[in-house]
């Protein structure tokens, strides 16, 4: 065994070879040294266990190939572009909404240049970083003011911490939601230092339940939109309109966590109806929070709109600075919101709406092209079909609703295994992510952003 250890080259010997010098030129001295040490450590452990040299140390050429391979993997970006063929348009694990071209350009400009983030160009003095977007949101929603933080969970936390610390927040039992990542409304309330007061039952809550729970220690009445589940059957709930009337009567503000946050009526596009921010403001809600990267189709952000007196208090809270967005996110958000000033062009300019409203005819054409390319690459190892599919919006939006779609399905035909094919899909330069259902791989075209790039990627198979 000692003789085997002696056959291992030293780091210094590797570095002084022509191949070693080439590796240093390509990857840098520090990275090459670290990789050599790592592989030598692994080789010593292998020798102890197997009493033989690992193959990649059997000759110098193999050794340098192994070092080069490790260095290449180390340099690869791990958050990489994928082809979304899951049928879930706003897929949380795949990054939710795609940014519009306008948002991308605005963000790129903010990255490369100094921008008027907190500077009033007209007055020539400092301003607030939310000002530009606040003006836009007021125009779009009818609210008096707006506040921007880094996601909707942060928006909820900020509202609770600002107005309800040490006080009571009244909410229906049927709205004590949990969303992805174990985010629970009661847990956020506990973190904010407020006291949860549950009213009603899971399936039925009445206005009198809220009224009877109000005390002099009540901070506000809270409504949470149940976007990621539905309670059906024998149910009853209280609308924001009813709740705001009660709030005005009892001098208690009303807050709504809308979650997905649509700014247009989706039913006009043949999609499931989702309550809009404008509707909640019109119903008299004091504060409405929602996400920027769900139905809005933009960047990850938490947006709060509502009465000016309440927004000013949010802006003054110390947590606001902790939760604020940077210039890139704000630039992308502003550009996204400006698209809503021309709603007639939204399905053309906003990727989320473009994907959700693609006609089935176009999806069938894309499916035929995809099937043809797959058949040419897989050599009859699998059975491929074009089938009707059911896509979904995703990210907790309309979980019970499905959108007609088209998919290419792949089933086992010979000894070739779907699991092996799925693994091959994930090893491509731009991995292909589909879904497994009924013993088949489903490649749903509804959620695919670019058919041409996908077809080019498949040439790697």
UniProtKB/Swiss-Prot annotation:
GO cellular component terms, A-Z: cytoplasm
Signal peptide coordinates: none
EC number(s) on file: 2.9.1.1
Alphabetized InterPro entries for the sequence: PyrdxlP-dep_Trfase (IPR015424), PyrdxlP-dep_Trfase_major (IPR015421), SelA-like (IPR018319), SelA_trans (IPR004534), SelA_trans_N_dom (IPR025862)
Modified residues (N6-(pyridoxal phosphate)lysine): 294
Major enzyme class: transferase
Function: Converts seryl-tRNA(Sec) to selenocysteinyl-tRNA(Sec) required for selenoprotein biosynthesis.
Descriptive protein name: L-seryl-tRNA(Sec) selenium transferase
Originating organism: Haemophilus influenzae (strain ATCC 51907 / DSM 11121 / KW20 / Rd)
């Amino acid at each position: 065994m000692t003789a085997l250890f002696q056959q291992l080259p030293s780091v210094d010997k590797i570095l002084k070879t022509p191949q070693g010098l080439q590796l240093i030129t390509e990857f840098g001295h520090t990275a090459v040294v670290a990789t050599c040490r790592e592989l030598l450590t692994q080789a010593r452990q292998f020798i102890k266990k197997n009493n033989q040299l690992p193959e990649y140390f059997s000759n110098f050429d193999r050794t340098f190939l192994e070092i080069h391979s490790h260095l290449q993997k180390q340099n690869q970006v791990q958050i990489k572009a994928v082809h979304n063929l899951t049928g879930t348009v706003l897929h949380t694990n795949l990054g939710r909404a795609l940014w519009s071209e306008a948002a991308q350009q605005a963000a790129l400009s903010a990255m490369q240049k100094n921008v008027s983030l907190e500077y009033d160009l007209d007055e020539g003095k400092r301003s607030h970083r939310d000002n530009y977007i606040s003006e836009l949101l007021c125009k779009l929603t009818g609210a008096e003011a707006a506040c921007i933080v880094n996601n909707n969970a942060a928006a909820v936390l900020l509202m609770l911490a600002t107005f309800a610390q040490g006080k009571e927040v009244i909410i229906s039992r049927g709205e004590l939601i949990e969303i992805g990542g174990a985010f629970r409304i009661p847990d956020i309330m506990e973190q904010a230092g407020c006291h949860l007061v549950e009213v009603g039952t899971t399936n039925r809550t009445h206005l009198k339940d809220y009224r009877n729970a109000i005390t002099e220690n009540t901070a506000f009445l809270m409504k949470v939109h149940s976007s990621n589940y539905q309670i059906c059957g024998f149910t009853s709930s209280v609308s924001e309109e009813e709740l705001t009337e009660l709030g005005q009567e009892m001098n208690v503000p009303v807050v709504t966590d809308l979650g997905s946050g649509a700014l247009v009526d989706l039913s006009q596009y043949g999609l499931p109806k989702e309550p809009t921010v404008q509707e909640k403001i019109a119903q008299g809600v004091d504060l409405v929070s929602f996400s920027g990267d769900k139905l809005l189709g933009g960047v990850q952000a938490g947006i709060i709109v509502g009465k000016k007196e309440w927004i000013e208090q949010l802006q003054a809270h110390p947590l606001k600075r902790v939760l604020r967005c940077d210039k890139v996110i704000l630039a992308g958000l502003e550009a996204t919101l400006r698209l809503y000033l021309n709603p007639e062009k939204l399905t053309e300019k906003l990727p989320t709406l473009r994907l959700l409203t693609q006609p089935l005819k176009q999806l069938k054409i894309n499916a035929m092209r995809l099937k043809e390319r797959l058949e040419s690459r897989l050599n009859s190892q699998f059975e491929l079909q074009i089938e009707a599919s059911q896509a979904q919006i995703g990210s907790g939006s309309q979980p019970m609703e499905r959108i007609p779609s088209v998919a290419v399905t792949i089933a086992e035909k010979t000894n070739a295994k779907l699991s092996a094919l799925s693994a091959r899909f994930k090893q491509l330069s731009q991995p292909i992510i589909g879904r497994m259902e009924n013993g088949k791989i489903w490649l749903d075209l509804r959620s695919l952003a670019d058919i041409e790039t996908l077809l080019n990627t498949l040439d790697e198979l």
